[in-house]
Amino acid sequence: MRINPTTSGPGVSTLEGKNLGRIAQIIGPVLDVAFPPGKMPNIYNAFVVKGRDTAGQQINVTCEVQQLLGNNRVRTVAMSATDGLMRGMEVIDTGAPLSVPVGGATLGRIFNVLGEPVDNLGPVDTRTTSPIHRSAPAFIQLDTRLSIFETGIKVVDLLAPYRRGGKIGLFGGAGVGKTVLIMELINNIAKAHGGVSVFGGVGERTREGNDLYMEMKESGVINEQNLAESKVALVYGQMNEPPGARMRVGLTALTMAEYFRDVNEQDVLLFIDNIFRFVQAGSEVSALLGRMPSAVGYQPTLSTEMGSLQERITSTKEGSITSIQAVYVPADDLTDPAPATTFAHLDATTVLSRGLAAKGIYPAVDPLDSTSTMLQPRIVGEEHYETAQRVKQTSQRYKELQDIIAILGLDELSEEDRLTVARARKIERFLSQPFFVAEVFTGSPGKYVGLAETIRGFQLILSGELDGLPEQAFYLVGNIDEATAKAINLEMRSNLKK
């Protein structure tokens, strides 16, 4: 981290004593730059090209050094469009890697890969910046205790708990509730853990990024009146941007998250949507730099690039970064090198089901497909583990019986199976929950449910103590006491109708 003079922009220093080179070749987003003998820059140094194109328009392009070619030339990748650049234009070596603003000034704002605000809300305080390239924390700094990161979301905490400082893969198609789940997690970490969140939009649609921003403002995650009270910083490098920007935007978001962890000593949530696009951008850059492709056309450095990003996401003695990464699986092929490399780093998977979303059960987290390495008796305790396993067994049995029910009907089942189905349907509905960020749409107040309350609720359903309550009483409630109260209300209403 460095303190810049107030006049400097993110990652761009003054001209005094700076290395100057000239553009020797332009091939799309790749620029070759020639320097005087003995003035070669370092790998990952940021370059700035300023000038005017033939139409007199101002040009300001930032590049990053990728290769030293010999003959006093370097090969760089541009972070923005190279339209209007010409051979012979002057290039300024900033003498340092790309640096971005960090700290409280970033909350409530949208940035590009360079750390420049793109939300038309004025300049950002750039006195404190940090380089996007840095080493992962040393072993001695790591906090290796296995601890659960409580989210207040019943289905997640019970069946696929998140690890503090862990990495979670979020799988789900369009329209099943990924955005709302992400916003609820951002809201809950701020309330329960006093933490903040950083959202990295890597290579996804601009429209989706805009929708997320608008929904965050509507739900109060971003406070327009007082940005300092916002709970999230947004960093976007969308589909239409050059591969260099899409490859580095994840590091920009991670750098902002690291400051909150290391300096502010907070628990941070880092969202990356989509981690596959990070790999895809790296593949494009690799091809542009002339490297020999590896399996299925991916870059030969795939594992190294993924590792350099993922190993920085961890818990230290100061704080933690817990990362939730949306994972696109090309052609649903889990053996594709991109998702396969990602899986090696994940501690948990949260799978969203279209079938549950169609039933109106939100969050639509699939209780059988979602997994976690934390769901072990020695980590979560015997009580939690046993309850989770019994919930999964009951749900699995219900799934197996659904074909029989569809063909023959519920009456053809044995007494034991009918009881299992009734409890499974209650469990399915009790796994739903009203969200704080959805209050503006549903009119129902959101609920944060502690882990102990969650376990108690499911134990009561499994024990049969609540067999007499109607299924509807368990739908969109917080803890089990609310379900009991709802059942009494439903009974009173039905009596009044009679």
Swiss-Prot record:
It holds the Pfam family ATP-synt_ab. SUPFAM superfamilies: C-terminal domain of alpha and beta subunits of F1 ATP synthase, N-terminal domain of alpha and beta subunits of F1 ATP synthase, P-loop containing nucleoside triphosphate hydrolases. One of its GO terms (biological process) is proton motive force-driven mitochondrial ATP synthesis. Signal peptide: none annotated. Gene3D superfamilies: 2.40.10.170, Bovine Mitochondrial F1-atpase, Atp Synthase Beta Chain, Chain D, domain 3, P-loop containing nucleotide triphosphate hydrolases. Its main location: plastid. It catalyses: ATP + H2O + 4 H(+)(in) = ADP + phosphate + 5 H(+)(out). Disulfide bonds: none annotated. InterPro entries: AAA+_ATPase, ATP-synt_VA_C, ATP_synth_F1_bsu, ATPase_a/bsu_AS, ATPase_alpha/beta_chains, ATPase_F1/V1/A1_a/bsu_N, ATPase_F1/V1/A1_a/bsu_N_sf, ATPase_F1/V1/A1_a/bsu_nucl-bd. The keyword Iron does not apply. It is found in: Plastid, Chloroplast thylakoid membrane. Keywords: ATP synthesis, ATP-binding, CF(1), Chloroplast, Hydrogen ion transport, Ion transport, Membrane, Nucleotide-binding, Plastid, Thylakoid, Translocase, Transport. ATP binds at residues 172-179. It is a peripheral membrane protein. One of its GO terms (molecular function) is ATP binding. It comes from the Eukaryota. The keyword Signal does not apply. Its EC number is 7.1.2.2. NCBIfam families: atpD. Produces ATP from ADP in the presence of a proton gradient across the membrane. The catalytic sites are hosted primarily by the beta subunits. F-type ATPases have 2 components, CF(1) - the catalytic core - and CF(0) - the membrane proton channel. CF(1) has five subunits: alpha(3), beta(3), gamma(1), delta(1), epsilon(1). CF(0) has four main subunits: a(1), b(1), b'(1) and c(9-12). Belongs to the ATPase alpha/beta chains family. This is ATP synthase subunit beta, chloroplastic. It comes from Saruma henryi (Upright wild ginger).
